[in-house]
Amino acid sequence: MYAENYKIFEAIIDKLREFDGAIIVEGPRDEISLRKLGVRAEIIKLSRLPLAEVALIASQYKEVMILTDLDRKGEELAKKLAMYLEGYGCKVDTETRRSLKMIAKKDIKGIEDLYNLYLRVSLRFWPPEEGI
């Protein structure tokens, strides 16, 4: 990860920690990674339920963040989920996933790798230099 992306990455992690809705991930390792980062939001895993059922459960929250993996399969899942959730009238956050993909796709394959990336870049860019 480049130094100029570090601040953006840090802001994404802060946003995840402060998020007050439900976060949809693909599997249990994704949830573990987010919990290690200090995320307290409700986390709904796709691995055990059909998409329509996940969307129905998530639709009970004011806002839903979709954090599927950063690969093609994750992209397809995110689009389908967003369509279902918008049909329920949910406010859907796909921008966080898009931002992560833009700055970290070369560094991680999926959400399960997020915590390890956070540790690596935190060590690399600590202490913060002026202008970073």
UniProtKB/Swiss-Prot annotation:
Official protein name in the record: UPF0292 protein PYRAB04740
Keywords, ordered alphabetically: Magnesium, Metal-binding
Residues that bind Mg(2+) 2: 69, 71
Transmembrane region(s): none
Keyword Metal-binding set for record: yes
Classification via InterPro entries: TOPRIM_dom, TOPRIM_RNase_M5-like, UPF0292
Residues that coordinate or bind Mg(2+) 1: 26, 69
Residue ranges of domain Toprim in the record: 20-100
